[in-house]
Amino acid sequence: MAEAEEQETESLEESTDESEEESEEEPKLKYERLSNGVTEILQKDAASCMTVHDKFLALGTHYGKVYLLDVQGNITQKFDVSPVKINQISLDDSGEHMGVCSEDGKLQVFGLYSGEEFHETFDCPIKIIAVHPQFVRSSCKQFVTGGKKLLLFERTWMNRWKSSVLHEGEGNIRSVKWRGHLIAWANNMGVKVFDITSKQRISNVPRDDISLRPDMYPCSLCWKDNVTLIIGWGTSIKICSVKERHASEMRDLPSRYVEIVSQFETEFYISGLAPLCDQLVVLSYVKEVSEKTEREYCARPRLDIIQPLPETCEEISSDALTVRGFQENECRDYHLEYSEGESLFYVVSPRDVVVAKERDQDDHIDWLLEKKKYEEALMAAEISQRNIKRHKILDIGLAYVNHLVERGEYDMAARKCQKILGKNASLWEYEVYKFKEIGQLKAISPYLPRGDPVLKPLIYEMILHEFLESDYEGFATLIREWPGDLYNNSVIVQAVRDHLKKDSQNKTLLKTLAELYTYDKNYGNALEIYLTLRHKDVFQLIHKHNLFSSIKDKIVLLMDFDSEKAVDMLLDNEDKISIKKVVEELEDRPELQHVYLHKLFKRDHHKGQRYHEKQISLYAEYDRPNLLPFLRDSTHCPLEKALEICQQRNFVEETVYLLSRMGNSRSALKMIMEELHDVDKAIEFAKEQDDGELWEDLILYSIDKPPFITGLLNNIGTHVDPILLIHRIKEGMEIPNLRDSLVKILQDYNLQILLREGCKKILVADSLSLLKKMHRTQMKGVLVDEENICESCLSPILPTDAAKPFSVVVFHCRHMFHKECLPMPSMNAPAQYCNICSAKNRGPGSAILEMKK
């Protein structure tokens, strides 16, 4: 029996997946059969009705039994109500009271946990029953029931039951639903709504298709909330809203009315309805036509989720259910019950009860994995990791990696490992070996952890060997990027050296080997490789690891590679490699020696003074433009040696400078005139020396050379009287631009006169201004008060008795004396002067004020 049940479950799952095969849309519901006790019941009996409470289920059968079941379908209690079919079961909201009616006219309302009971037998089948939702309360002891008429039973204050007819005369009552203060029921003509508070019927909604037999295609009712009623009948669905009538409209009308807010047709016959948020769950009875016999047959019922619109609906999902015996069932044999609290939907048929549940995140992930949407599944699991129960993020991630590997997306698979494997070192190592098996170690290498966690050295070495065999550049990149403590450095060094035996000039391998040596602190070997390769990092290596002792015999190599950087490094580290050592090492390479000594001289004119004599020859040979600046700046250069070298090489400018520096200005001037034939330079030289004899020699040399005379006339006006030159010009000599030169001389002379006159005016004006200022200052009054003292006797300058006569002398220097304290002026020097200022050589101050009283 268990095997048969398992096969049926698989069949149910296959049927619900039919629409999934046609579409990639995810189903909204999942299904399972209600088994255990239900299976035993339906093997011997058939289900006729069921009602659902949050805590338990109540199932009625064709043999008059009512079973209470837990949510797994286990039987908890059994009631023998009637020998015939149970038509309907009703529970109050508390789940403590139940009403049952049967085909033989029996009616029972009783407490499940108390002795409270009401029973009645009618002479006609009782089709429906609904107890008040708050039946547990003494003020709400009411229920409705009916067959051909709808009766309301109420318990009076004397604990007796009385009944009243709410409606009759429109055929059998086939469906009823009670919500709050509203009762909705359906008969052959339509749906009525009754307000239990006002005791008024407030609406009548007629059925659309009167051609359908109401006993074969019964009406389905459900309340979405206290004011929203959903009606399904035939292929029509109506959503009705109970509204309050405005006071001005009431007159003799009920205070409430029903408005149809949405109405639309469906493709199939409706067997049941249930709300799902703002959507509807619809159980449909399906008839199809056989292609072979062209006869109608009963197809599998469908459970659809639809989105109601004002005049139509949108299908969200649709599942065909393979319930037991569906080929023999009619529309009236199916019922849809639901649990509002847990969104559970029960599809009830005579031989089967199927539970539909909203799919949770685990189900969503199942579907994504089934559709091989691993990326979305992983994302969904991460977002809902607190809510998922059956799935683990790691398992989904590993499945995703395997999927990518199977598809050949090795780089993507390796990239995802970073996120999925995280800090799990053992999983990392496992995945690396998997990549090795498929020959894709290179793909995972960029994503291996390098810090936290750290894998076994063998893992990193295995990948390095893989690159070393096929990709030198990739190998070099990994060596640069990976910290050296990840692997056994000596093992990799030996592997590289083995490869260099086959290709000794491979620059990539040599450079990588140098980096490995550097990490291994074998700087000497690394330095040799860098120098051989002329690698730019050689200077950084020397500085960083203080390898100056290792380069003392490699200075020429460094200079050949980059003389500028080498010289800067050597000069910055004179304390480690002396100037003498560098000069000795470069003895056979004078051009490099010059570069070094030249930079040394630029930094400090005195440090390399012992080599200044050598530098004369070096500058003359390799850098003449800097020879003259060197001669000018050096104070340790032997002038005779320098003069000898410059004369040998016929360096005129340098020779002129040396001659002038040695005091032989006349020879220097003569050389300028005879060798350079440059009157401007000669004039400039004469100006620098500022020697009259030189000007005389210059005039004598130029007197028979008209171009030189022109140059002199144009330039000597501010240094030598031009008349001396003009008087010596031979009569009749043609001098180029003589007029312009004379005009320039006159202009220069006139300019000098103007400058002198201007200076004179400024001087006179300043003197007059200062004189006036001094006069104004001396004319000002001088304050004399009790605090002033006589500079001679040091007593207060003013007497304590103001009535006594006194005489005070105040000089322009502001020193004050009693008149009697000053010596009397002599006949030879009638003017008086301040004794203090005269003694300090500040100049005599004359009296400016004499106060008497």
From Swiss-Prot:
One of its GO terms (biological process) is protein targeting to vacuole. CHCR repeats lie at residues 567-711. Its main location: membrane. Pfam families: Beta-prop_Vps41 (PF23411), TPR_Vps41 (PF23556), zf-RING_Vps41 (PF23555). Keywords: Autophagy, Cytoplasm, Cytoplasmic vesicle, Endosome, Golgi apparatus, Lysosome, Membrane, Metal-binding, Protein transport, Transport, Zinc, Zinc-finger. InterPro entries: Clathrin_H-chain/VPS_repeat, TPR-like_helical_dom_sf, VPS41, Vps41/Vps8, WD40/YVTN_repeat-like_dom_sf, WD40_repeat_dom_sf, Znf_RING. Residues 1-32 are annotated as: Disordered. GO terms for molecular function: identical protein binding; microtubule binding; zinc ion binding. Residues 1-25 have a biased composition (Acidic residues). PROSITE patterns: CHCR (PS50236), ZF_RING_2 (PS50089). GO terms for cellular component: AP-3 adaptor complex; clathrin complex; clathrin-coated vesicle; cytosol; early endosome; early endosome membrane; Golgi apparatus; HOPS complex. PANTHER family: VACUOLAR PROTEIN SORTING VPS41, VACUOLAR PROTEIN SORTING-ASSOCIATED PROTEIN 41 HOMOLOG. Belongs to the VPS41 family. Plays a role in vesicle-mediated protein trafficking to lysosomal compartments including the endocytic membrane transport and autophagic pathways. Believed to act in part as a core component of the putative HOPS endosomal tethering complex is proposed to be involved in the Rab5-to-Rab7 endosome conversion probably implicating MON1A/B, and via binding SNAREs and SNARE complexes to mediate tethering and docking events during SNARE-mediated membrane fusion. This is Vacuolar protein sorting-associated protein 41 homolog.
